[in-house]
């Protein structure tokens, strides 16, 4: 292998040879057996952190945390999931989230705001940004929507997402529970979402255990989401903006989430019309995105009186 799986993953930034090595280890042994263009891995241990979606141009790959999760998702009926509405959250106001010295803990993410505004235009949905993107409001709205997209800071160690502090709080200084969306918070919500997109730094890397990646992505699945799109390592905000624009354009064209992911990665890898795109052909920019859970297909704007999205479900054999 030329190193342990962990060593290969740590070097992934940055070396096409590492991606080829992962292909040789994970996909090459079964390549001749594949008779489909859609493949699901149930990874364990450090293999949870492999960028499966980037391993092949001919096969669309997604993952599932465990066989138990696969059974639950496969057994869920279409009627359970919401058919409309989207929750778009981007660039929460974080200037009140400070250290004891008064210095802000986090920088604002202007590209995240542009990201959800772009998606909002496509879905005819007003995004939550700035002071409106509070933890309380996000928890309130996420219960009934079909699509959740959060573009914000995330933490790889605890699976937490940083939102704007709740305005109703007992102390002048924002406490962690006022702005951190934790795994416990998500577990407590009964979701009806078909797809959750976490456009957040480190949003895919929780603590690795035998049941799968334990992080905010798994929390959303356990709370009822059918599929989650996450990034496995820190992501450049401009590259993410371009990636998401391509991803949602393909979703709007009624392509499945896995196929939209495939096209968006290819777009970022190959786009060379403008000089600013050239650096994004590096693996570290286009390869971190992975689809966890089921595959879904959206239909945008079928009924003009319905705000948000309408869903179609992929036919299964």
For each feature predicted by the language model, list its residue ranges.
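Catalytic cores of enzymes
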Residues: 1-317
